[in-house]
Curated annotation (Swiss-Prot):
Entry's family note: Belongs to the intercrine beta (chemokine CC) family.
Gene3D superfamilies from the UniProt entry: 2.40.50.40
SMART domains: SCY
Subcellular localization: Secreted
Listed GO MF terms: CCR chemokine receptor binding; chemokine activity
Name recorded for this polypeptide: C-C motif chemokine 18
Assigned keywords, A-Z: Chemotaxis, Cytokine, Disulfide bond, Inflammatory response, Secreted, Signal
Organism in which the protein naturally occurs: Macaca mulatta
Pfam family for this entry, one: IL8
Role this protein plays: Chemotactic factor that attracts lymphocytes but not monocytes or granulocytes. May be involved in B-cell migration into B-cell follicles in lymph nodes. Attracts naive T-lymphocytes toward dendritic cells and activated macrophages in lymph nodes, has chemotactic activity for naive T-cells, CD4+ and CD8+ T-cells and thus may play a role in both humoral and cell-mediated immunity responses.
Coiled coil: none
């Protein structure tokens, strides 16, 4: 049951967030942020969006290699980034 709930959460999150590619490099912009906090155990890496984007964002990478756009001003996003930097 927990596995099904986690999978459903990830699928809903992916459906709620969008990324748009900018230019010829693999730079993405977040058009919409995820509305829910993703469990930290699913996040393995992150990247910041390009300064050319109209909206700042953090792209979280899940264990299943899914990209999730998150608001860089949210406390939980800042904590995940800090923890990922410490464990790098």
């Amino acid at each position: 049951m927990k596995g099904l709930a986690a999978a459903l959460l990830v699928l809903c999150t992916v459906a709620l967030c969008s990324c748009a590619q900018v230019g010829t490099k693999k730079e993405f912009c977040c058009l919409v942020y995820t509305s829910r906090q993703i469990p930290q155990k699913f996040i393995v890496d992150y990247s910041e969006t390009s300064p050319q984007c109209t909206k700042p964002g953090v792209i979280l990478l899940s264990k299943k290699r899914r990209q999730i756009c998150a608001d860089p001003n949210k406390k939980w996003v800042q904590k995940y980034i800090s923890d990922l930097k410490l464990n790098a």
